[in-house]
Amino acid sequence: MASPTLSPDSSSQEALSAPTCSPTSDSENLSPDELELLAKLEEQNRLLEADSKSMRSMNGSRRNSGSSLVSSSSASSNLSHLEEDTWILWGRIANEWEEWRRRKEKLLKELIRKGIPHHFRAIVWQLLCSATDMPVKNQYSELLKMSSPCEKLIRRDIARTYPEHEFFKGQDSLGQEVLFNVMKAYSLVDREVGYCQGSAFIVGLLLMQMPEEEAFCVFVRLMQEYRLRELFKPSMAELGLCIYQFEYMLQEQLPDLNTHFRSQSFHTSMYASSWFLTLFLTTFPLPVATRVFDIFMYEGLEIVFRVGLALLQVNQAELMQLDMEGMSQYFQRVIPHQFDSCPDKLVLKAYQVKYNPKKMKRLEKEYAAMKSKEMEEQIEIKRLRTENRLLKQRIETLEKGQVTRAQEAEENYVIKRELAVVRQQCSSAAEDLQKAQSTIRQLQEQQENPRLTEDFVSHLETELEQSRLRETETLGALREMQDKVLDMEKRNSSLPDENNVAQLQEELKALKVREGQAVASTRELKLQLQELSDTWQAHLARGGRWKESPRKLVVGELQDELMSVRLREAQALAEGRELRQRVVELETQDHIHRNLLNRVEAERAALQEKLQYLAAQNKGLQTQLSESRRKQAEAECKSKEEVMAVRLREADSMAAVAEMRQRIAELEIQREEGRIQGQLNHSDSSQYIRELKDQIEELKAEVRLLKGPPPFEDPLAFDGLSLARHLDEDSLPSSDEELLGVGVGAALQDALYPLSPRDARFFRRLERPAKDSEGSSDSDADELAAPYSQGLDN
């Protein structure tokens, strides 16, 4: 459904048809070649007036754009000759657009700055952004049939978009319906951006000039090619960049006003966010905002920076006298209506502002580097927080496991004590075995001696009984050790499977093997002793018959020799078993010592790594502490310097204000003298001349009175200078997220939509006490500003 082409309102028609406020001719700013081209165009345009097609195009409803290239004072019909020339010229531009863009770009730029005629805006805007033939136009009808997740938000804000305009007034009106269609279609085309507050005002202005399909194509091109898409993204990173660049320009060109804003905590985003998001459509009336939008379509966001800084330059003196609340009201009530009668003056002021594209590119790179650095710092902080959380969890785990470790250490200590007792018993058994072997050797030596006494035999019997007793005790001790080993195995099975416990179990197993070998050796020794005892008993039985026949003596000697051989064999076997057991013990001890050394080495390496980590962490913390101290000292010095600079600049500004007021008074007097002199030159009445001479004398007397007082009699004296709020680091935003978080949402809401009834009653109550003072200050400001503005015109 296409929307008809509508004019903004009646006031816009009057403003667009008004002549240029500046009395100087624009032809003075053109080169000779361009002037010659204009003369030729005038000749061709006059010839084209005779053509019927040109006449039909001229006889329609027309509106003047408020600017022309060649001024003319003659009027022959309803449309002046100036309007006819402008219409014919813009018709030629629309028909020969490509040639004008290639060869006459400078002249085209001047024409656009003077203003595009209302009925040409639709086609010229489409040509400027190359939106005449876009593939997305064919998809528009299909997009309207789809559903968008942003429909509720769009419906909510449509009623607050141009609520006073006839085209959008009334619920479910034609204007609101086509506005909803365009916003819904774009939210489906660009799902990343979707819908953002402020974009509806731009679409609404487009719908006032062209049908909805063409408005949709132009809006898509604006979002893609004019940086608006980056402005309306959820992160609003481009808006932060624009605020950063505008703050730099404000600080460079208006340092006193910038200092005043900071001292009052009046952030740039509180008043400039809506300028960039709505392109002044919510700030100025539609005639003035449309002029700014014409230039934006050709030059981009540069005009927003220029117009914004021009507004601050014009109102610097008034803003310097206001606090934060007063400045907010001044931006909402006074600034929007300063250029209603003459938009050309605003454009002239805007192009007097210094704008350096290279410097803006450099600021963009600095902002990107700053944002990347902030992102890296946030990532590093997040990593440190994660690491800190993991360390805390590890400490809690270690504290919980500390009790278990203590219990394990106590149980290991008990096992080691029992193992020491078992080793001591094993060593005593080995000593008993050595004693038994020495006894066997003594018996063998005595066996070699044929003469044995009864005392020696009784001694051997006593030793045999003692050895049997010791053997019985050894067997009892072995049984006790076996019981203890079984008990320790049961206790070890209930303990956690740690490295030290496993090693102790291996040692216990090796000890059990050695104990088994010792038991086997003891049994074999017992058998050998039994055999030796039997042999000895037999020998004793034969000892009483040694006086028998020689044959028996020979048999006895052979038996003795056999017994000695067996004793030597038993001794050799015992020595072999002893050596094998010793080898096993040495291997076990070597294995235990190696395991112990490995554990000690692992613990030493772990402690060394922990020591290095703690040393590195301590070094980093010391570096951060020194850096923080250095930054704090620099910040304190910088704050003191800025305070002194603010005081000096404020004193200079007060002196400049006083000088400017005196200069304004002098200019007013000169203007009155010139006016009276002109009247004198054209008058023939002598009586009138005498009256004028009297008036001149009175004016001269007033001049002497005005020149008499000193320039600092007003209340703005240096004695009243005070700096209650100094700049410090706390008053400045730490990042763009905080800057946007403080001011963007509130400033955008206040700029886009009117105040609620409750807020309006609050501001009316605030205005009642200061009504008289405001009236007097406004009248004084108007009296001082009127001659100054007329002097600029002259």
Swiss-Prot record:
Comp. bias intervals (Polar residues): 1-30
InterPro entries: Rab-GAP-TBC_dom, Rab-GAP_TBC_sf, Rab_GAP_TBC_domain
Residues flagged as site, Arginine finger: R156
Chain segments carrying region Disordered: 1-36, 49-75, 766-794
Ranges for domain Rab-GAP TBC: 115-300
Stored SMART domains: TBC (SM00164)
GO terms of molecular function: GTPase activator activity; small GTPase binding
Subunit structure: May interact with RAB10.
Name used for this protein in its record: EVI5-like protein
